[in-house]
Regions:
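Conserved catalytic palm subdomain of right-hand nucleotidyl-transferase polymerases, strongest
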Residues: 1-20
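Short, conserved non-catalytic motifs in the polymerase core
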Residues: 43-69, 96-102, 156, 170, ...
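Short, conserved micro-motifs composed of acidic
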Residues: 111, 126-160
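Basic, alpha-helical interaction scaffolds
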Residues: 155-221
Length: 363
């Protein structure tokens, strides 16, 4: 669900009223009022300036308190009684529903979207139904599917972009990876034109921070991608290394050896192991712990650092992070798993190559 300038639309008086309802005392409310009020803005075009106007809505952008105030303001949205489930990250809201028939799902979504749009309107927020993205999972042809929102028929699409990740109606990420590799290849082309003017150290820094860093966004989401998608990633990675070292003859493995690095897939496996270490040691948010739980043992056995393997019924489940990650974690040496600190674990996992991984990309 698309919101226009969500952080700039928060009414100050309604925000203060909600803070008071949540139990903020009078001194705290006065301090927050002082923080929000007495702010002015004006427009300058050339040498001409408009008169100053008081800002009555919105929270200061770039501040630490801005996102906190927004989360408090929108918190009662999730107290509504909906038939659908709602997920939120900052001002990005997504609802999803399931049912026995398409018509049942459509009715649930239309009813709940009506309630949500009413909430946005009453709370001074501007929603753009025309920009809402709608997708029905599992259906090959969605062209005839529509949702009626505020009298407008909005069509369903085959793919949606959720927090920067392209997902299709089969929950495949091939399109996202294709666009990601296209972006990397464009940067490699620009890098090739500049490389002759750069020192080796400068070229390496550009390669790592501007080009290959594109693969660092949500890598665990597309970690166990298709063979074709993984091949596309490797081709982009190889092209980058060839330009970096001006070596257009060596194989990908020789280039990796020269660069003293691993494939993107192995790097992502290392990141997965790091996240599991954090879950086992309770270093990350508690809602992630259930995905990788330690086996409960009574005695001090070698299995005390192993993770439970979730039960799976289909092959699809065997490619999930919870199953594949726990299975791979259990193959790590005790020396790595029992690292005393996160820094020590990260240092040791760098040399790990995932040689015992049994996913289809490693076999």
């Amino acid at each position: 669900m698309d919101l226009s300038k969500a952080y700039d639309c928060l009414p100050h008086d309604l925000l203060i009223a909600k803070l008071e309802a949540y139990g903020f005392d009078n001194d705290s409310l006065q301090l927050i009022c002082s923080y929000l009020e007495s702010r002015y803005q004006r427009v300058k075009i050339g040498s001409c300036k408009s008169t100053r106007r008081k800002i009555k809505i919105g929270v200061p952008q770039g501040s630490v308190l801005g996102p906190l105030f927004f989360n408090i303001f929108i918190n009662d949205l999730f107290l509504m009684s909906l038939e659908s489930e709602i997920c939120n990250f900052a001002d990005d809201n997504t609802i999803f529903a399931c049912g026995n028939t398409i018509q049942e799902i459509v009715i649930k979504l239309e009813n709940d979207l009506g309630l949500l749009l009413d909430w946005f309107s009453k709370n001074g927020m501007i929603a753009n139904p025309e920009k809402f993205q709608i997708m029905f999972l599992g259906l090959s042809d969605q062209r005839c599917l529509r949702l009626n929102i505020e009298g407008k028929k909005l069509p369903a699409t085959d793919t949606v972009k959720l927090l920067g990740i392209q997902i299709d109606n089969k929950l495949k990420l091939n399109k996202h990876i294709h666009e990601l590799c296209s972006k990397v290849n464009q940067k490699v082309s620009a890098f090739a034109r500049l490389n002759t003017y750069l020192s080796p150290d400068q070229a390496t820094k550009i390669c790592d921070t501007i080009i290959l860093s594109n693969f660092n966004y949500c890598p665990l989401v597309w970690l166990f991608c298709s063979d074709a998608a993984n091949d596309e990633i490797n081709r982009a990675h190889k092209r980058c290394l060839r330009v970096l070292y001006q070596d257009f003859e060596s194989s990908f493995q020789l280039l990796l050896s020269r660069d003293n690095s691993q494939t993107i897939h192995v790097k992502n496996l290392q990141k997965l192991m790091t996240e599991i270490y954090k879950s086992v040691k309770k270093l990350n948010p508690s809602y992630l712990w259930e995905f990788h739980e330690r086996k409960e043992v009574t005695y001090d056995l070698r299995t005390k650092d192993l993770c439970k393997l979730p039960k799976i019924k289909k092959r699809y489940g065997s490619e999930s992070l919870s199953f594949r990650g726990s299975l791979l974690w259990n193959t790590l040496s005790d020396n790595i798993k029992q690292s005393p600190t996160l820094a020590a674990f990260k240092n040791q996992i760098k040399s790990w190559t995932g040689d015992k991984c049994t996913c289809r990309l490693c076999l």
